[in-house]
């Protein structure tokens, strides 16, 4: 199995795990019971999001790496992740404003917190991918060395 397929499989497992934990958290009120549970979930969501972005842009990521351009890779990953997470936060505000749903508790400070911890998680996920690429020597294969 190639690395792209492994990344997708890990993404699917992590997404399913996150779904289960979130379902349990809502049922048992963990978001209200544990002070930093929301931060932990957004960090985990960032890792999951990074795995998805790595799978989606796999060839582009390898191209960045084959040109030894880590800075552009991290910037690209972070901007794409922030765009997706930002749209999610806009959706939360919209749903709360339009439908009067109050359990989302959308507010600017929470949104900033969500974006920060999600982005940190996405950087951890990207770092995992970079270490995997390095351990499998995929860069040499890309360069033809």
How should these model regions be labeled?
Residues 1-107, 112, 119-145:
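Bulky hydrophobic segments
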């Amino acid at each position: 199995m190639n690395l792209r397929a492994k990344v997708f499989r890990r993404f699917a497992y992590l997404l399913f795990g996150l779904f289960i934990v979130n379902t349990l958290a809502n049922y048992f009120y963990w978001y209200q019971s544990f002070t930093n549970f929301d931060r932990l979930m957004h960090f985990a969501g960032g890792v999951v999001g990074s795995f998805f972005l790595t799978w989606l842009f796999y060839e582009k990521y390898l191209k960045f790496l084959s040109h030894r351009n880590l800075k552009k890779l991290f910037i690209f990953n972070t901007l794409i992740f922030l765009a997706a997470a930002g749209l999610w936060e806009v959706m939360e505000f919209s749903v709360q404003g339009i439908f009067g749903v109050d359990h989302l508790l959308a507010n600017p400070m929470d949104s900033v917190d969500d974006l920060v911890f999600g982005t940190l998680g996405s950087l951890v996920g990207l770092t995992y991918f970079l270490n995997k690429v390095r351990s499998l020597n995929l860069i040499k294969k890309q360069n033809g060395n």
